[in-house]
Curated annotation (Swiss-Prot):
The lineage of its organism: Bacteria, Pseudomonadati, Pseudomonadota, Gammaproteobacteria, Enterobacterales. Its main location: membrane. This is Putative 2-aminoethylphosphonate transport system permease protein PhnU. It is a multi-pass membrane protein. It comes from Salmonella typhi. The gene is phnU. Belongs to the binding-protein-dependent transport system permease family.
Length: 289
């Protein structure tokens, strides 16, 4: 006579859920809860009711429209400059090695660790009204006023951001260029292909994922950059992060500041979504920078 033993149910393993719960709890505490407070403050009108009154007030403001246009203009031009300068420098350092190229590559890596205000301070010492360049020109040509004054304009902000964020393009791009099969370049050279054609048909497709990833990172960082604009003190250059600062700290208008911050968040997410869409259309997989 056979005995039928009851099947024991396996014990429920809660360890995977615990490992999932801990990061979710930290994320909710450090990110979603403060974000919900910003959203609530932004949507709460003067009468205490939730609505879009503050949103309409902000959007109708010429100051906000100007800050939005300045933010987009600085972000796009700075990103384009980073991609152009980073591509040229990466091609030279990888495919045209020269004495000291390794040292320059290490200096580029060091730039990533430097705070943005330090680069801006160096720009002030060099291109400022009392900087080295203006001092030398005024001494040589007896100018009464500093001849170089682009630093305190939008062009100065863009140039400073290009200097700060170009290493973020070069680092992944140089890694991608070093993985290109040199035999393909040698074959194209033997067949008499023009260097520009080699770049367009061999190098560019291999470098496209790195360019897309680093370009999107630069676009997001330049859109939300605050320290460079504040430290340079460019006249008439107001951006969304600067407007959030002035509304919250200088004017104590926290409702409007939260609404502008919320719009800035939506803008950043929108730009990132455009990058993801472009990457999917071109068949590029996102890579970490």
């Amino acid at each position: 006579m056979s005995l039928i033993l009851p099947l024991e149910k396996p014990a429920l393993n809660l360890r995977p859920l615990l490992w999932l719960l801990l990061p979710l709890l930290a994320l909710a505490t450090l990110f979603f809860w403060p974000l919900s407070l910003i959203v609530e403050q932004a949507l709460r009108g003067a009468n205490g009711e939730i609505g879009l009154e503050t949103f309409r007030q902000v959007v109708d403001s010429k100051r906000f429209v100007g800050a939005l246009l300045n933010t987009l203009q600085i972000a796009f031009f700075a990103t384009a400059g980073c991609l152009l300068l980073g591509s040229v420098m990466s091609l030279i350092l990888v495919f045209i090695p020269f004495p000291g190229s390794e040292l320059i590559g290490r200096v580029v890596d060091t730039f990533i660790a430097l705070p943005t205000f330090l680069i801006t301070l160096a720009f002030t010492f060099i291109y400022g009204s009392a900087g080295l360049l203006n001092g030398a020109l005024m001494s040589l040509f007896a100018f009464e006023l500093p001849p170089v004054d682009f630093l305190y304009s939008m062009q100065g902000v863009i140039l400073a951001e290009i200097t700060v964020f170009t290493p973020l393009v070069m680092r992944p791009l140089m890694a991608a260029l070093r993985q290109i099969d040199k035999s393909q370049l040698e074959a194209a050279s033997i067949l008499g292909a023009h260097p520009l054609r080699v770049i367009g048909q061999v190098i560019f497709p291999a470098a496209l994922p790195a360019l897309m990833a680093s370009g999107s990172l630069c676009l997001l960082l330049t859109t939300n950059e605050f320290g460079i604009v504040l430290f340079i003190g460019a006249k008439g250059v107001n951006t969304l992060p600067m407007m959030v600062y002035s509304k919250a700290i200088l004017e104590s208008d926290y409702t409007v500041a939260c609404m502008i911050a919320l719009i800035n968040i939506v803008l950043s997410l929108g730009l990132f979504s455009l990058y993801r869409l472009a990457a999917s259309r071109t068949g590029v997989r996102s890579q970490p920078c």
